[in-house]
A protein has these predicted regions:
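Bacterial N-terminal signal peptides that target proteins for export
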Residues: 1-12
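Bacterial N-terminal signal peptides
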Residues: 10-21
Length: 362
């Protein structure tokens, strides 16, 4: 009588099981969102498909697009446009602070500025189509959108001012004077005020979002580039580029609590709090990294290597990825936030400046 090897018998049984009960890996749905990137030098937006990271469209919008944000429902993209020419970076002193000279490049740029190009561009996110430009004051650089989607709070860089614009009427309702080179804008979670970060002196202005009046101000080290609030509204984070540090602010009383040194070489730019409020991410500029901070302690947990001089950053609607605009390398880094690793780069020619991610309704 022929005998069957135990090994052959086991293999045969396994094959039978596989034939009767085939097992397939479950399909994983891709991210259902799109990413809009403002390209400062080419005057357009790059649209990236969140599912496969392909470039879905390029949308011409106007001169020097920088700050870019979405309406609360994600259906409209707003982008700051400016006719003021791009300047060479200012000379820095021994502490890394900019040196400004009367009659220098800043004055030349003002003389050459095309003020007719200034405004906020309005883009239909689903159709990926530029619709119109609305007034926004002189040289708008960045802005924030109110929680109800009715107003824009805008930093007017060359005017040392901040504008409040009614989107429906397309009119400037209030103009608040701040200090030199206002850039970052962030609205408090309760909507009652907004912060404006002013680079030159390190002033942070707190402005009433209804009246446009100054509530208070406080100072940090020079070149604060941006601000963001934790979801609960109790804390704000403001990076100081020159000092290479993060400022932690009591956002209830609008007072500086402490500063935290970032890793050596960091020149922090754009800050974003995670949707769950547990971590804070900041682009480190010339260091070519994203710094990850614990939101409770402000301790630096990790640094993530990305492209050249990351500027604007955005977190995907599902909270799983971070996108960083790398101006000098003309690309966008894609970071997996679970592993905190860069997983891809997508070309975005034209010096990418800002980035925003919204649900894809196509």
């Amino acid at each position: 009588m022929r005998t069957i090897s135990p090994l052959l018998l086991r293999a045969a049984l396994l094959s039978a099981v596989c034939l009767v009960h085939p097992v397939a890996a479950p399909a994983q749905p891709g991210p259902d969102y799109q990413v809009f990137v403002s390209n400062e030098r080419s005057g357009d937006l790059t649209v990236i498909n969140g599912a496969d990271l392909s470039v879905a469209a390029t949308i011409p919008v106007g001169k020097r697009p920088r700050g870019i944000h979405a309406s609360p429902d994600g259906k409209t993209i707003y982008v700051a446009l400016s006719g003021t020419p791009i300047s060479a970076p200012p000379q820095l002193d021994a502490q890394g602070n900019p040196i400004f000279q009367k009659g220098g490049d800043d004055d030349d740029d003002d003389a050459k500025a095309d003020k007719a190009a200034d405004g906020i561009g309005v883009v239909d996110a689903a159709r990926r189509k530029f619709l119109r430009k609305i007034p926004a004051g002189s040289d708008p650089e960045n802005f924030a959108v109110s929680a109800d989607g009715a107003r824009l709070f805008i930093s007017n860089e060359d005017a040392g001012a901040a504008s409040i614009v009614n989107i429906a009427s397309e009119k400037i309702e209030h103009l608040a004077l701040v200090s030199r080179e206002p850039e970052g804008v962030a609205v408090t979670p309760d909507g009652g005020a907004f912060y404006v970060t002013c680079e030159t002196a390190g002033d942070i202005f707190v402005i009433d979002s209804k009246t446009g009046r100054e509530i208070t101000r406080f100072s940090v080290h020079p070149r604060p580039r941006s601000a963001d609030f934790l979801p609960g509204g109790a804390r704000a984070f403001i990076p100081s580029e020159s000092a290479g540090e993060m400022n932690v602010v009591d956002a209830i009383h609008h007072k500086l609590l402490r500063t935290v040194a970032l890793p050596k070489g960091s020149r922090p730019m754009c800050v974003k709090a995670a949707p769950d409020g547990r971590k804070v991410y900041v682009s480190a500029g010339r260091a070519g990294t994203i710094c990850v901070l614990d939101a409770e302690t402000a301790e630096v947990l990790n640094t993530i290597k990305v492209g050249a001089r990351p500027w604007g950053i955005a977190i995907s609607p599902d909270g799983r990825r971070l996108y960083a605009a790398n101006g000098p390398s003309d690309d966008v880094s894609v970071v997996d936030l679970a592993t905190e690793k860069e997983i891809a780069r997508v070309k975005s020619p034209g010096s990418p400046w800002g980035v925003v991610a919204v649900p894809d309704t196509n």
